[in-house]
Amino acid sequence: MAARKNKKPTAEPARVSAKDLHVKGLKSEVQEQPISDTLKYNYMPYAMSVIISRAIPEIDGFKPSHRKLLYTMYQMHLLSGARTKSANIVGATMKLNPHGDAAIYDTMVRMSKGYGALLHPFVDSKGNFGKVYSRDMAWAASRYTEARLDGICGELFRDIDQDTVDFVDNYDGKLKEPSLLPTTFPNILVSANKGIAVGMASDICGFNLSEVCDTTIALMENPNHDILSTMLAPDLPTGGELIFDEKTLREIYDTGRGSFKVRAKWRYIPKQNVIEVYEIPYSTTTEAIVDKVVELVKQGKAKEISDIRDETDLSGLKLAIDLKRGSDPEKVMQKLFRLTPLLDSQSCNFNVLINGQPRVMGVRELLQEWITWRMDCVRRRLNWSIARKSEKLHLLQGL
């Protein structure tokens, strides 16, 4: 006879005692709760966390993720000397920023000179860091690239060890990090910054560093200074031609909200019958432009074009558009401006955290807030210096 298989005894379902029936969530029943309580205890903490700790820049021009990365690199003595592996920087940053390595590396890439998203990059990079104007150009892994702080970062950390800003605990309370960086120039208007929070967003376009500094000095001397006379227009990293009128720009400067058009720059090569596009709007990519032009050709809306190629190389961006014989390049470009992202809009929403409160401000109000904050940094530095000298004087008098 075949041996009988031993059947394992089945476990009896756990019994719920009478006293456990009063445990909330143990019984399958609908718990009624006013929607106001749900918003207060569930939605609001999440929304405020995203607004304050993630998406909206502060008066120094940085989000927390940017600040943690740059301060870590400063602590690694990367303001001078040789570059180090990006993976080394990412690993060290995790002591202040409890995110994955991919998120931290993405932050570093977007601040790098190689990526080209900022007028004045903070990370001096070496290796393939991709390009801001390319959607499909992937950057190399952190183990292959190297980085250090760019020279301009000396102005971000000047006097940081002289009590110019507050230091707070990191996420586990084992390290200290600055709540703000004591930037000696209005970085909030120099470095382009974009963030999407819960119920609000921020979109700050960059301006010329020299113009911003001149405007700040003029405002300190005369609070009624005409800002448009010294800050002529925004300055975008990818170039292009800005299309706006004075009324539109004044509205942006006064309210912190508005938009303007940005048009690609191009040239015509008669010998080759080719249009070369060498600067594009900041808000689009070369792939998006090529895809749209190809779509127009297939639909028969751009019959003058025989081919389009992305010839971007180490010398810079270049889109080559081959024209058919007898085509007028001016008319072709006017059509492409109308139907493709070669002409795009740039939105402005100057939403900044001031003392933990999000505020949409115009350029004048934003610079005045920066001046007030910077004066406080200088005052704290002087008080620190006086205290150190007083201690030294006390010791000398004791001798």
Q: Residue ranges of each PLM-predicted region?
A:
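C-terminal interaction appendages of subunits in large macromolecular complexes
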Residues: 2-17, 26-30, 34, 194-196, ...
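Catalytic phosphate-handling regions of large nucleic-acid enzymes and associated NTPases
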Residues: 2-256, 318-320
